[in-house]
């Protein structure tokens, strides 16, 4: 987006979207909507479509918000074929396996939790590796701190632990649920400052009204991103509204 007029138009449209976003839910509603599971310290399994993933202790098992991202990867809303893909917070590796099935050229699977990057690598090898031409680089990293200096991505996804209220003090639950909005603004700053997107590249971030939507998206717009909604979803019996944001750089 090198045309100044196009950039100005994208900024106006982004701010118009920003004004329409909902305020955060009350604290008690946020806490009620994010009650932690009690099994994070156990060996588990997780099934998505026809893939069954192993989930060791400490690795988070995906919920409905994660599956919203998985579905958009699988249905082509997020285009991966022939592209370089970075998944921030790779967990047990579902995004990586889907990306291989959708023809991604290479995948950077990042997570701050070492057992999660190991689990992603193991599940990827077992479920996708033998028949896939996609290369996987599992990286244990605080955001992009350990991301290769010369690497760039066409697509980056992040389902951040941006819930604004503390729903637990268990470190594994906090890490996966309620770090807060700062982790997203740091993520966006690093993408911009290190120029991590290829020309025409896209960032997809999942946020709901259990997070500080206005602060996070406002920071993105002020930092030069255009912001669109690629998908939005409500949940039966809940006031939670979840958004998959598509962000682009000039």
Can you annotate each of these PLM segments?
Residues 207-250:
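Class I S-adenosyl-L-methionine
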Residues 200-206:
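Conserved beta-strand signature within the Rossmann-like core of class I S-adenosyl-L-methionine
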Residues 1-44, 48:
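N-terminal auxiliary segments of SAM/dcSAM-dependent transferases
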Residues 171-197:
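Glycine-rich S-adenosyl-L-methionine
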């Amino acid at each position: 987006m090198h045309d100044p007029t196009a950039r100005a138009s994208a900024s106006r449209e982004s701010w118009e979207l920003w004004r329409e976003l909902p305020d955060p839910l009350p604290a008690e509603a946020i806490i009620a909507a994010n009650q932690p599971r009690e099994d994070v310290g156990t060996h588990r399994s997780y099934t998505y479509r026809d893939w069954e993933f192993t989930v060791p202790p400490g690795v988070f098992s995906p919920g409905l918000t994660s599956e919203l991202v998985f579905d958009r990867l699988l249905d082509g809303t997020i285009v991966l074929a022939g592209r370089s893909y970075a998944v921030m917070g790779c967990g047990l590796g579902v995004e990586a396996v889907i990306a291989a099935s959708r023809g991604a050229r290479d995948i950077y699977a990042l997570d701050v939790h070492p057992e999660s990057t190991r689990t992603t690598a193991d599940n990827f090898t077992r479920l996708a590796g033998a028949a896939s031409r996609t290369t996987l680089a599992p990286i244990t990293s605080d955001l992009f701190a350990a991301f290769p200096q010369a690497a760039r991505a066409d697509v980056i996804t992040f389902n951040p632990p941006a819930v604004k209220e503390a729903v637990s003090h268990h470190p594994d639950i906090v890490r996966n649920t309620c770090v807060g909005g700062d982790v997203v603004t740091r993520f966006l700053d690093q993408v911009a400052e290190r120029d991590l997107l290829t020309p025409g590249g896209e960032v997809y971030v999942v946020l709901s009204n259990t997070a500080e939507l206005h602060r996070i998206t406002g920071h993105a717009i002020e930092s030069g991103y255009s912001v669109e909604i690629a998908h939005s979803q409500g949940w039966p019996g809940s006031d939670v509204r979840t958004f998959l944001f598509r962000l682009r750089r000039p």
